[in-house]
Amino acid sequence: SYFMSDSPGFNIIRSYEKDNYKIGGVDKKRSFIDSARSFPQNTEILHTLTFSASKAPRANRTKTFSFQVNHSIIALPEDKMPIRYEDERVGWFTINKINYSSEKLKSDSYNIVRRWRLEPSDLEAYKRGELVEPVKPIIYYLDPGTPIKWRKYFKMGVEDWNSTFEKAGFKNAIIAKDPPSKEEDPDFSPEDIRYSTVRYVASTTRNAMGPSVSDPRTGEIIESDIVWYHNHLRLSLIHI
């Protein structure tokens, strides 16, 4: 099956590792699906792929390498959001597209902006220049593993962005919440594509990142995860 074979498009193994360890094909006897979970708009499949390695490190007596890989199968919005083309004068995260219908007799490359779908709840008030709430605000849920002493500040950091959204005519556009308890919502899961999260990682890594899932047709951000490593604050202190 698809989940029991290697896909070069995912680059599970870097080329120099393949060369150094003489990594071959997938060993299907040692590869398997670990779990599969379905949600209203996505399915998450976790599987293990094992590869043969004729020149594995000495400590590796199995002569194999195993990797856990997660695939997300996501339903895209039926109502496509209008595209916004990149303006190179402004910094954006973008999706590169290729136009094969160009009259220049060659393919043309262009970029579309990755952005949230923020639509005014009161269009007439919005046109008058009044601040209005969006139909669907951006909501981030805190990772349950976030230390209690930091939660207040994580929320403040997320909601500080409201001042920026107000310049675009929206109030209360971005909200940070604690995750619901099992009693409040037994089906809540950070793997559910309907929920964006702020994930705390107990790691010595001095970094943070914000990967997102976007509709490749339009650039609409469907879900986002802010990943905050424990030692990121230490990195900030160095630059003060």
Question: How would you label these PLM feature ranges?
Answer:
Residues G157-V158, D192:
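Short secondary-structure boundary/capping segments
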Residues S1-T146, T164, A168, A173, ...:
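Auxiliary tRNA-acceptor-end handling modules of aminoacyl-tRNA synthetases
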Residues P144, I148-M156:
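Soluble non-cytosolic domains of exported or imported proteins
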